[in-house]
Regions:
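Alpha-helical solenoid scaffolds in large eukaryotic transport, assembly, and signaling factors
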Residues: 1-58, 79-83
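Hydrophobic residues within the alpha-helices of tandem HEAT/HEAT-like
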Residues: 5-9, 40-46, 77-84, 112-120, ...
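HEAT/HEAT-like alpha-solenoid repeats
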Residues: 15-26, 50-63, 87-99, 124-138, ...
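Short inter-helical turns and helix N-cap capping residues of alpha-solenoid HEAT/ARM repeat scaffolds
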Residues: 29-30, 66-68, 102-104, 141-142, ...
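Beta-propeller blade termini and top-face loops
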Residues: 69-71, 80, 104-105, 111-122, ...
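Internal, well-ordered domain-core segments that constitute the primary functional module
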Residues: 102, 114-148
């Protein structure tokens, strides 16, 4: 039934009235079904902002305690795509511990969510000190996390009109080291 709902949504049919029913499926362990539910929620969150709070706890739980890095990353990516105040406030809190996740996949997704958060709430990005967190990620052991952090800082620079990508020599040495490795 969920696949039918998503198929209807993708061809332009209004299935927003099913929002409460779809939210009930969010706790599924089936990753494919979870992806479909998250896609639906991204699509209809602005239409049903009063109901998105039903999903916020599940996003938060999946991002923090998801069984796999894929689920944790999917949860924060979805939260980043939903520009509704109820989700934005939780995203700030959620990103704080996602940047500390042991898996680089989760950290790279966290980095990419900061510009989305900045678009909606620059004040929250400053309060949570995410610009410094992104700069700290420039020293990450994973080159994809480093690249995504640079991309995020660049996007925020464009959005803010001020250069946020202030590379210190310690960051540059680290970045050059990874650049050499990836060229080989």
């Amino acid at each position: 039934r969920s696949k039918q709902i998503i198929a209807s949504m993708t061809i332009g049919k209004d299935v927003s009235k099913l929002f409460p029913d779809v939210v009930k499926v969010i706790r599924t362990k089936n990753i494919e079904l979870k992806k479909l539910v998250y896609l639906y929620l991204i699509n209809y969150a602005k239409i049903k902002p009063d109901l998105i709070f039903l999903a916020v706890a599940a996003f938060h739980s999946d991002a923090k305690e998801g069984a796999t890095p894929l689920i944790r990353g999917l949860a924060i990516r979805t939260m980043g795509c939903i520009q509704v105040p109820e989700v934005v406030s939780y995203l700030g809190e959620t990103l704080t511990y996602c940047f500390k996740d042991k898996d680089p996949y989760v950290r790279k997704i966290a980095a990419l969510c900061v510009p989305k958060l900045y678009l909606t709430s620059p004040q929250l990005v400053r309060e949570k000190d995410f610009l410094n967190t992104l700069h700290d990620c420039l020293k990450d052991e994973n080159p994809v996390v480093v690249a995504n952090s640079m991309q995020a800082l660049n996007e925020i620079s464009v959005l803010s009109g001020a250069n946020q990508l202030k590379l210190k020599s310690k960051y540059l040495r680290h970045i050059v080291k990874y650049h050499r490795k990836t060229k080989q």
